C-alpha cells in the first residue's frame, strides 16, 4: 500500500469512529469493487431498492448487479414523463433501501449535501428503512465550511454539466448563486450530523476518488 493510500485509510478509519458516535454505521473498502460487494451485502433479498442521482453509484457499477438479489427496483431515471418521474421519486421515499452518494463528508463524520430537487436529501433524512451512502476519499473535508466550498466549487459545476442544466456555472465553471426555475441545482443544503434511529444510515468509505 502506498503512503498516500495508507494515509487515506487512517483518515477513513477515524471518520468511521466518528460516524458511530452519530448513530451511523461506517465501513471501509479499498476499491470500487469491494464497495459494490459491500452495498450488495447490506441489501436484503427481495428488497424494494431506490436511489438518488449519483455518479459514484454509476462508477462502482452496483445498480446493474441488483438483479442477483431479486430486488424490486424504483428508478426515476427510467421515465421521461415528468409525472412518472415525480411518482417514482415519491415511491422511493417508502423503499426498503435507498442508495446514494454524498457531496462531502467531514472528518467529524457529518454528511453535507446540496440538492436541486430535494428527493435525494429527503430520503437521506426520512422514509426508507435503510440508507446506504457510498463516498470516495475525494469527498473528505475538514469541516462543514470546507464541505460547502468543495461542493460549490467542484460538485455542483460538474453535476450541472452532467445534467445539461442552463446555469452560469455550467458555462463559466464558477457558482453564481443563481435562482433559475427548473435549472438551479443548489436549491437546498442538508447537514446530517446525527441519526436518531441507530444504524439506519450506512456509510461506505472507499479508498479511491469517486464521483464529483
Residue ranges and their predicted role:
Residues 1-8:
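Glycine- and acidic-residue-enriched helix-capping/strand-helix junction motifs
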Residues 93-212:
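Conserved phosphate- and dinucleotide-binding cores of soluble alpha/beta proteins
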Residues 2, 24-26, 137:
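Short, flexible active-site loop motifs that bind/organize anionic cofactors or intermediates
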Residues 8-89, 94-99:
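N-terminal active-site beta-alpha-beta segment that forms phosphate/nucleotide-binding
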